Amino acid sequence: YKGEVLGLVGQSGSGKSTLIRSIAGLVKPESGSIYYDNRDIVRADQKDLHAIRRKIQMIFQDPYGSLNSRFVAGRIIAEPLINYGLMSSADAFKRVRELMELVRLDPAWINRYPHEFSGGQRQRISIARALALEPEILLCDEPVSALDVLIQADVLNLLKDIRSRMDLTMLFVSHDLAVVRYIADRVAVMNKGEIVELKSAAEIYSNAEHPYTLQLLDAIPIPDPSIESKRISF
């Protein structure tokens, strides 16, 4: 639904990344359709795909590998604005500074290269770049899995804040159910390329029904040994 965060969970190889990359138009599925704004992304020509990508942006798992190491932060964030020819260089520079402030990066760092930032800061650059075109949908492909726990919390809180401010719809992919529980309104569980369960985040954790979902929940680490010993085994 518009304005919600839909979590997509499943083990490695379940098809999560393939699905999200298909929605982004980065890979073409062998069959089926993906509709956005009454247009089939799978069968869209380059012109339509270019227009669709303006409204659907993506944050990748690796905050370093997804950034061009030859560009400074300001150029990286401005790249979508340049590619779509939406504003002059002066206006783009101003917009970049606004985006850096939005993702809680010091605009004074605008001329730093990716290697001069921490992992969490690099992911904030990726988020700023994804927001440059003011998309309607933000695809998040394991955006915090490469970060340590404290930085994960900071980035998740940032995404929640941005979602509220911009009325964004998010598809948040993760293998970590604790992370998804924190950020998602609803959760879809994927196994072998199929959605096997779809419920509100609260219901998934309190009233899961599918055996695969129960198995994922059972795999969440619990620090209390007395509780750990009572886990269900499959």
Describe each PLM feature range:
Residues 24:
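Helix-to-loop junction immediately C-terminal to a conserved catalytic motif
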Residues 113-117, 121:
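Conserved ABC ATPase signature
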Residues 132-136:
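A short, proline-enriched helix->beta-strand linker immediately N-terminal to the Walker B motif
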